[in-house]
Amino acid sequence: MSVDRLASPDADPGHVWPNSGTDSGFHDGPRSIHAHVTRPIVEQLAKAGAHTVLDLGCGNGWFTQALVRCGFEVLGVDHNEAVLRQAQAQRPSVRFEVMDVMQALPPGLSERFDAVVAIDLIDHVILPRRMVETALAALKPGGLLVVTCAYYGYAKNLALALAGRFDTRWDPLLDDGRVKFFSRANLTQLISEFELQDMHFQTVGRIPMFARSMLVAARSPD
């Protein structure tokens, strides 16, 4: 598994990496978050020696395909059947399945994967513990769970408020968006409830106190 197969964010920002903050609607390319989290996630997967990976909430499948290009065997799942049809049409060599992370794990996926990745999913579900339970059910013993979500810390929240951008982050009028707003303390507390091992935490994108996102990786018991 090679991180070197990832394109550098400096190589071709108009093609490989997004230069827009908008994530609305289906499009074939990466979402803005992928520019920050892809390399750290692949590094965690490589460090764990993972081969089989489940990509929860894969959306248009860009990240799923990026993992395949890095040498992983990947299944991308999402609840949105229409989006997955387009993802499959755009990426015919990548495997996708319709799956609702709020429901029981489908037959055949239990304890099947070396790693489960969920990019910006846990803060978009009403019941985040259920999402974690579904992810852990798919892991082999000793498998790696990698979760990312938007970072919300005191300094960043204060800066947003002073800049007059607070409402853009907590806009109740959006038809879609985050329903949970995690800090480092409550995200790591949530993961700790499941008695996982070797927890790793890092912020990504910008300096730590104003980080774009945060990443938690931890192993299920052997």
Q: How would you label these PLM feature ranges?
A:
Residues 82, 126-130, 157:
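Short N-terminal helix/helix-N-cap motif within the alpha/beta-hydrolase-1
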Residues 1-111, 115, 131-132, 147-149, ...:
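Conserved N-terminal segment of class I S-adenosyl-L-methionine
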Residues 147-168:
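Conserved class I S-adenosyl-L-methionine
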Residues 193-196:
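A structural motif corresponding to the C-terminal end of an alpha-helix
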Residues 115-121:
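A short beta-strand submotif of the Rossmann-like class I SAM-dependent methyltransferase core
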Residues 69, 126, 140:
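Short conserved AdoMet
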Residues 130-141:
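A short glycine-rich, Lys/Arg-flanked "PGG" loop and its adjoining helix->strand segment in the class I
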Residues 105, 142, 153-155:
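Feature marks short, surface-exposed loop/turn motifs that line or immediately flank catalytic pockets
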